Amino acid sequence: WEYESGLSRFGTPMAPMLLPYFTDQCLGSMEGLYFEASSTTPFHFINQSELSPNPSSAQRDLPYPGFDMDAGIRHLQLMGVKYYLAASPQAIEAARANPDLTELASTGPFSTPAGEDRDWTVFEVADADPVVPIENLPVVLTPEDDHIDGWVYGERPEATEEAPNPPKPSGPAIDWYLDPVRWDTPLATSGPDEWPRIDRESAMQAPSVPAPDPDIEISDYTETNESISFTVSEPGTPVLVKTSYFPNWQASGAEGPYRVSPNFMVVVPTENEVTLTYGRSMVEWLGLVMTILGIVLTVMLGRGDQRRMDAEAALSATP
């Protein structure tokens, strides 16, 4: 959705995050309540900059491109975002001129605190499938680094007297995201041995190695809060799943998932039926076990103290 400061008339300019609540989960919000916890956030704010004449540009140290409806819609297609909500006359006019958008409905006008009229207009984005086969094999960057400062950002320059807090340069994932020519060859932080490798300093010169069969069909896509499943016509071709990568995702019927640019997942189906499930990591299981042991130990110590106090009370009561 288009960002504008006038949304504060609802109490906060982030009010559209409640779209899932008001639409009975029919529509989601790309910008969520816990967006600080996701490495997909920087890419969202780049989209917001392209799709909002007056964006918030909330994440620092990003090369914001400015309002560009065509570039913004290409990014929504890349990220599998199906709808775009425009409010300002400038954004609505640009959206109506974009051939990849279909106007669905509008409501309003509403008055902003500045006395301006606003219509909310919803557009459907074409070619925004949530799961797609990839044309070329992902290229694994070496040395492997999953940290946001090696993926989204580059190394921060040394501070100087003139620049005590210099901005971070963009990392390989951001550079890739802003160059549509490279989108057919995702960058990866890890992957099978047959995927090509390249030094991360040369990421933008990554080779294009064709995938085994990029024309496979994907069907029966189903998504819940904790699982994603789909069917492929032929196993073996890497498939891009346009959902934020996190180590808790586990694949059944496929190898992976592997983290790829911008911050999505690729799996390599070994069967026709593929399921991704969001479970617990080893660190979480360890933390859970330690928590249970801590509770048990606390109860045991408490009971021991109670028995000691009871024994002392009995001794003091003996004539």
Question: At which residue positions do the language-model features occur?
Answer:
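Generic recognition of flexible, low-complexity loop/linker segments
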Residues: 16, 70-75, 109-111, 216-218, ...
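Short acidic, glycine/proline-enriched helix-loop-strand junctions
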Residues: 91-125
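Short, polar loop motifs at secondary-structure junctions
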Residues: 87-91, 244-247
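Extracytoplasmic/lumenal acceptor-recognition loop(s) of multi-pass membrane glycoenzymes
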Residues: 1-78, 137-213, 245-247
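Active-site-proximal, structured, solvent-exposed surfaces of multi-pass membrane proteins
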Residues: 185, 189-319
